[in-house]
C-alpha cells in the first residue's frame, strides 16, 4: 500500500463488473465495467460540468484501507437503498501521480476499490452525489484535453483503462480482485471461552447463559484424561521426517451452524463416502453450469449439436478458463471437435486461461485425427505459441502421448504447406492475394507487410473492412479475419442494417489520420495511384461536394487520364454519352447538371491537352487530380451514418438521414439522399459531446451559436475519431 506518511491526496476509483462472465475473460472489454464518478461545475461556467473521481484526504496515523472503505460507504449512502452505502471488497493502490500547479512536487495516489457485480438494485440520483457510468462510454470521450473531465481525473482514467487491460492478461488476477473480502468469507466465528485469555474476547460471540469464567471452570472440571501418551520426539534432538500420513476433510465444513439435536455421527465405513460427496457436489455444479463443456468432454455429438441449436456460446469459458473445444481436443473427441468448428463456428485459435490453443491440446494428447482436422481449418494459426513460447509440435514431442508420432509428422508437414490467402481490394476493383501465415490470428499490420509496399508507402495506408453501408478502419493490432467473421454482430451493434445484405470485404485505403501536409510531399507513383483511385471513387459516389467549376476541372482531368490527348475527330460532343459521363461526373450531377456541362468539360479537356506547361505523365496528372481534391472539405474523410431532426412544422419533426464525415479538417454533414453538404465545421469552430448510452452526440457551432444532435449507434466511434484527429493538429493548423 505504500508509506502512508507520504500520501495526502487520495483519489478513489470504485469499479464494478456488469456481470460475472467478464471476470473470467482473458480479453479486457471496458463495456463490461462501471465506474463511480462525481459531476462538479466548471469554474466560471455555471451550466457546464465536468466529471471527477472520488477524492479524500488520508490521515497518516490511521489505517488507510479501512479509511478509504469507510469514505466510500459514507459518500454513497444518499444514492443507495436504505442508506446503506456501497461496500468495497478491498483497497488496491494502483500508482501515484505527480500534481501540477500549486501542488507541484507532491503526489496523489489512485486507489482502486472493487465492488459487487451489478444487480437489479436501483440507485437514486441525488445532485452532488456520485453515480455509476459505463467505463466504455467514459473512455470514448476521455482525454487530458477534454473539457468533460478534470485533467488529473482524465490522466488517472487512461491509466486505469490500461491497468485493467494488463491485469486481464494475468491468470486469476481479475477473479481475485473481485473475490469477497476475508471478512465476508467468514460465515461464523465462535471463540471457545475456555481458552479466552480475556473476557473481551468473547464479546458478541455465542452465549450459552454462563459467563466465560463459569464455563471455563466447568470445562476444566470435566477435562479428565483416562490415558496420557507422550510424544517421544517432542523436545528431543532426534531426527524425524516431517510428512503427512493422512488428511481427513470435515464434510460439514462451510455448511453453517448445525442443529446439534439432529446430528448423527456416521459409521466409520461411511466416512470415505462423505468426504467424496464434496467433490461430487462440485462436479455436479460444473455439469449444471457448463452443459456444452460436459458434452464436449464426453463426446456426445447429438446432445452437443442440440445445445448449439439452442444458442449456447462455443466461446464461453468455465471456472478453469477452458472453452468446450479445449475439452474436446484434450480428451480426443473427434466428432465433438468437428461439430464445434463447423456448426458452432468456433475459432480454432481460441486460447484458454494459460494461453494454450486447441492445437496445443490435441498435439499434447497425441490425437492425430483432431490435429488433422485443425490443420485443415482455413483460419488455423500453425505458428501459434503458448504462455511458455512452445509451439504445438514442441508440446507433442515433450508429452509423447498416444499417437504422438503421427501427430508430430502432421505438424511438421503443415509448416511447409501453402497458406490460406485473403483478397485485399483497392478502390479501382483490383486486388492482391495475401498469405495468412497466422490464420485468423493474422493482424492488420502483418497483412500490410504482405501487400509488398515499401515501408514509406505503408505509412499512408491501412486495412479497412467495408460492406455496402459501413466502413471501419483497422488499427495495426486488429485481426481482420476475425472481424469479417463477426461482421453480423458488428452491424447489429453499430447499425440497423440487414446483415444478409452487407457482405464485408477487406480494402487497402488511405489512413484517415494522414495529415495533408504529409500527403502533399508524396512522390511515389504507386502511392499516388492508390490515392487517386480512392479519390476518384469518392468523387463519383458524390461524397466530394464542390462548386460546378471544380467538378468540371476534375472531369476534364479524368478524360485526359483515361483517354489521353484530345482529338477533334474522335472526341466530339457525342463522345460524352451517358456511360462516359458516369465515369467522370458525380452520380448526383448526372441528371441535373451533366448534360449542360458537356461543352464546358470538352473545352477544358481540349485546353488541358494542348497546354505545353502540363506534364502528360500519368502520375503527374493523377497528382493534379489530387491537388484539386485537397481543396474539397470532405477529402480524406471517414463516413458514418446517422439522422438529424428538423422542425417541419410546429407540431412535428422531419427526419433527415445524413452521412457524418470526419477528417483532419473537421466534421461535415451530407444529406444521405442528395449528397448536399448541410454543414462543414473546422475543429476551431465547434465543440462536441457524447450523449447518454452512446446513441447520439451533440454539436455546438461557436460561429453561429447553433446546436444540433446527430442520432447514430456509431456516436462513440465518431467522437473518438474527432478527439484523435483534433489532438493531432498543431495549434496553427486548427485555424487554417
Curated annotation (Swiss-Prot):
Chain spans, region Interaction with ITGB1BP1: 172-195
Tissue spec: Expressed in heart, brain, spleen, lung, thymus, kidney and testis. Isoform 2 was more frequently expressed in the thymus than isoform 1.
UniProt repeat feature ANK, residue ranges: 287-316, 320-350, 354-384, 388-419
Keywords: Angiogenesis, ANK repeat, Cell junction, Cell membrane, Cytoplasm, Cytoskeleton, Membrane, Repeat
SMART domains from the UniProt entry: ANK, B41
Membrane topology summary: Peripheral membrane protein
Domain FERM, residue spans: 420-736
Chief site of localization: cytoplasm
Assembly behavior: Found in a complex, at least composed of ITGB1BP1, KRIT1 and RAP1A. Interacts (via C-terminus FERM domain) with RAP1A (active GTP-bound form preferentially); the interaction does not induce the opening conformation of KRIT1. Interacts (via N-terminus NPXY motif) with ITGB1BP1; the interaction induces the opening conformation of KRIT1 and competes with ITGB1 for ITGB1BP1 interaction. Associates (via N-terminus and C-terminus regions) with microtubules; the interaction is inhibited in presence of ITGB1BP1 and active GTP-bound RAP1A. Interacts (via FERM domain) with RAP1B. Interacts with CDH5.
Domain writeup: The FERM domain mediates binding to RAP1A and RAP1B and is necessary for binding to phosphatidylinositol 4,5-bisphosphate (PIP2).
Protein name, entry field: Krev interaction trapped protein 1
Species annotation: Mus musculus (Mouse)
Amino acid at each position: 500500500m505504500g508509506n502512508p506518511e507520504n500520501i495526502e491526496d487520495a483519489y478513489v476509483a470504485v469499479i464494478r463488473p456488469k456481470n460475472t462472465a467478464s471476470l473470467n475473460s482473458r480479453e479486457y472489454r471496458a463495456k463490461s465495467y462501471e465506474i463511480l464518478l462525481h459531476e462538479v461545475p466548471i469554474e466560471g461556467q455555471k451550466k457546464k460540468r465536468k466529471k471527477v473521481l472520488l477524492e479524500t484526504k488520508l490521515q497518516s496515523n490511521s489505517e488507510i484501507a479501512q479509511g478509504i472503505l469507510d469514505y466510500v460507504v459514507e459518500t454513497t449512502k444518499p444514492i443507495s437503498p436504505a442508506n446503506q452505502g456501497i461496500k468495497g471488497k478491498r483497497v488496491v493502490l494502483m500508482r501515484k501521480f505527480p500534481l501540477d500547479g500549486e501542488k507541484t512536487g507532491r503526489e496523489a495516489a489512485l486507489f482502486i476499490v472493487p465492488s459487487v457485480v451489478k444487480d437489479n438494485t436501483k440507485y437514486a440520483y441525488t445532485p452532488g452525489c456520485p453515480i455509476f457510468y459505463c467505463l466504455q462510454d467514459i473512455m470514448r470521450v476521455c482525454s487530458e484535453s477534454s473539457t468533460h473531465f478534470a485533467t488529473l481525473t482524465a490522466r488517472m482514467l487512461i491509466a486505469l483503462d490500461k491497468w485493467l487491460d494488463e491485469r486481464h492478461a494475468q491468470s486469476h488476477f481479475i477473479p481475485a480482485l473481485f473475490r469477497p473480502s476475508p471478512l465476508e468469507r467468514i460465515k461464523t466465528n465462535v471463540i471457545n471461552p475456555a481458552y479466552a485469555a480475556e473476557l473481551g474476547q468473547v464479546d458478541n460471540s455465542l452465549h450459552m447463559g454462563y459467563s466465560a469464567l463459569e464455563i471455563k471452570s466447568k470445562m476444566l472440571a470435566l477435562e479428565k484424561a483416562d490415558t496420557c501418551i507422550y510424544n517421544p520426539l517432542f523436545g528431543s534432538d532426534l531426527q524425524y521426517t516431517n510428512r503427512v500420513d493422512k488428511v481427513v476433510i470435515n464434510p460439514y465444513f462451510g455448511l453453517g451452524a448445525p442443529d446439534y439435536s439432529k446430528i448423527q455421527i456416521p459409521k466409520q465405513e461411511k466416512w470415505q463416502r462423505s468426504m467424496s460427496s464434496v467433490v461430487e457436489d462440485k462436479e455436479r455444479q460444473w455439469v449444471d453450469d457448463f452443459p456444452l463443456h460436459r458434452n464436449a468432454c464426453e463426446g456426445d455429438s447429438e446432445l452437443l449439436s442440440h445445445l448449439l441449436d439452442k444458442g449456447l456460446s462455443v466461446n464461453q469459458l468455465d471456472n478453469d478458463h477452458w472453452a468446450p473445444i479445449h475439452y474436446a481436443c484434450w480428451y480426443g473427441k473427434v466428432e465433438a471437435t468437428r461439430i464445434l468448428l463447423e456448426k458452432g463456428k468456433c475459432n480454432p485459435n481460441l486460447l484458454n486461461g494459460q494461453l494454450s490453443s486447441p492445437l496445443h491440446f490435441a498435439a499434447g494428447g497425441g490425437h492425430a485425427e483432431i490435429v488433422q482436422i485443425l490443420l485443415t481449418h482455413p483460419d488455423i494459426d500453425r505458428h501459434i505459441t503458448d504462455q511458455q513460447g512452445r509451439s504445438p509440435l514442441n508440446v507433442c514431442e515433450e508429452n509423447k502421448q498416444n499417437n504422438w508420432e503421427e501427430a508430430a509428422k502432421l505438424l511438421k508437414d503443415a509448416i511447409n504447406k501453402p497458406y490460406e490467402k485473403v483478397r485485399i481490394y483497392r478502390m479501382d476493383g483490383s486486388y492482391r492475394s495475401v498469405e495468412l501465415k497466422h490464420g485468423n490470428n493474422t493482424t492488420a499490420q502483418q497483412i500490410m507487410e504482405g501487400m509488398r509496399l515499401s515501408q514509406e508507402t505503408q505509412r499512408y495506408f491501412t486495412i479497412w473492412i467495408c460492406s455496402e453501408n459501413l466502413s471501419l478502419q483497422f488499427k495495426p493490432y486488429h485481426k481482420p479475419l476475425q472481424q469479417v467473421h463477426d461482421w453480423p454482430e458488428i452491424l447489429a451493434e453499430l447499425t440497423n442494417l440487414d446483415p444478409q445484405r452487407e457482405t464485408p470485404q477487406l480494402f487497402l485505403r488511405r489512413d484517415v489520420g494522414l495529415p495533408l501536409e504529409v500527403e502533399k510531399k508524396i512522390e511515389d507513383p504507386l502511392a499516388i495511384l492508390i490515392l487517386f483511385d480512392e479519390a476518384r471513387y469518392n468523387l463519383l459516389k458524390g461524397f466530394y461536394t464542390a462548386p460546378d467549376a471544380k467538378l468540371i476541372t476534375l472531369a476534364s482531368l479524368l478524360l485526359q487520364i483515361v483517354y489521353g490527348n484530345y482529338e477533334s475527330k474522335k472526341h466530339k460532343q457525342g463522345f460524352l454519352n451517358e456511360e462516359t459521363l458516369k465515369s467522370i461526373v458525380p452520380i448526383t450531377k448526372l441528371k441535373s447538371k451533366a448534360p449542360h456541362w458537356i461543352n464546358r468539360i470538352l473545352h477544358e479537356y481540349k485546353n488541358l491537352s494542348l497546354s505545353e506547361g502540363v506534364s502528360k505523365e500519368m502520375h503527374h496528372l493523377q497528382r493534379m487530380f489530387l491537388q484539386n481534391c485537397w481543396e474539397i472539405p470532405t477529402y480524406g474523410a471517414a463516413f458514418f451514418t446517422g439522422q438529424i431532426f428538423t422542425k417541419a412544422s410546429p407540431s412535428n419533426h422531419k427526419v433527415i438521414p445524413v452521412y457524418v464525415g470526419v477528417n483532419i479538417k473537421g466534421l461535415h454533414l451530407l444529406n444521405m439522399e442528395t449528397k448536399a453538404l448541410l454543414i462543414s465545421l473546422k475543429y476551431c469552430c465547434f465543440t462536441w459531446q457524447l450523449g447518454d448510452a452512446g446513441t447520439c452526440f451533440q454539436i455546438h457551432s461557436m460561429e453561429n451559436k447553433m446546436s444540433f444532435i446527430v442520432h447514430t449507434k456509431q456516436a462513440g466511434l465518431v467522437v473518438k475519431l474527432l478527439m484523435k484527429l483534433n489532438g493531432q493538429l498543431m495549434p496553427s493548423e486548427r485555424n487554417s
